[in-house]
């Protein structure tokens, strides 16, 4: 039982509010003290009142995030870990849980925040392309609906496993790919912001395990 009866408290939960954690499993994530992941949606979804009796919630004064700096040696890296996570933390503090909407936050307010940060030159974490995730998938054909995290960003991709560069093909919003029988394609994509800032690389391995028909 959380001892909130005697003193006011600020909540900082390890699973949801330790901002030194990595956001994804991508190989190009910075080194972190923790091996667990903290995506933005998990931060936004945290409810400080959960598990606390209604009569005790008046002792909860606010929410707090921690940033452990054993592997964070520059102000720029600290800014990268904090932005845009700090906006999700703010909404935890001032929005009743029944009024929170991840979709509204991620599709309306977050893009506006990201555009302002990018224009300011402040270091921040640029989200990877929306509509595709790291992993593996099997089949003959695959379809994706891809969105950049905010207007003005480009999504570049490769199909040979190489890290996408500025000169690689731009991924359209509706993206279809067919994989020949018995073959595999390594789809990699990255967001590139107007400032030139890049997201981590998303890698999806697509495999068609159907065998080719051998002529008799």
How should these model regions be labeled?
Residues 20-141, 149-153:
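Substrate-binding clefts and catalytic carboxylate motifs of secreted carbohydrate-active enzymes
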Residues 1-8, 13:
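Single conserved hydrophobic/aromatic residue that forms the stacking wall/gate
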Residues 100, 106-216:
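Short, compositionally stereotyped local motifs that mark structural "simplifiers"
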Residues 1, 72-75, 166:
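A generic structural signal for short coil/turn motifs at secondary-structure boundaries
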Residues 10, 33-37, 87-92, 170-172, ...:
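Glycine-rich loops and low-complexity Gly/Arg-rich segments
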């Amino acid at each position: 039982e959380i001892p909130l009866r005697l003193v006011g408290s600020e909540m900082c939960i390890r699973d949801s509010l330790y901002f030194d954690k990595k956001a994804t499993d991508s190989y190009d994530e910075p080194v972190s003290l923790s091996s667990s992941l903290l995506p933005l949606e998990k931060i936004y979804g945290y409810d400080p009142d959960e598990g606390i009796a209604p009569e005790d919630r008046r002792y909860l004064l606010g929410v707090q995030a921690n940033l452990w700096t054993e592997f964070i040696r520059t102000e720029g890296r600290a800014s990268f870990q904090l932005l845009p996570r700090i906006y999700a933390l703010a909404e935890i503090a001032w929005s009743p849980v029944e009024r929170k909407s991840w979709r509204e936050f991620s599709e309306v307010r977050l893009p506006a925040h990201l555009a302002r940060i990018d224009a300011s030159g402040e270091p921040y974490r640029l989200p990877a392309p929306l509509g595709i995730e790291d992993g593996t998938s099997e089949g003959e054909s695959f379809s994706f609906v891809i969105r950049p995290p905010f207007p003005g960003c480009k999504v570049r991709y490769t199909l040979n496993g190489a890290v996408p560069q500025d000169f690689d093909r731009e991924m359209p919003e509706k993206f279809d790919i067919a994989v020949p029988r018995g073959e595999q394609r390594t789809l990699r994509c990255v967001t590139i912001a107007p400032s030139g800032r890049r997201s981590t690389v998303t890698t999806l391995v697509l495999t068609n395990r159907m065998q080719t028909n051998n002529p008799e």
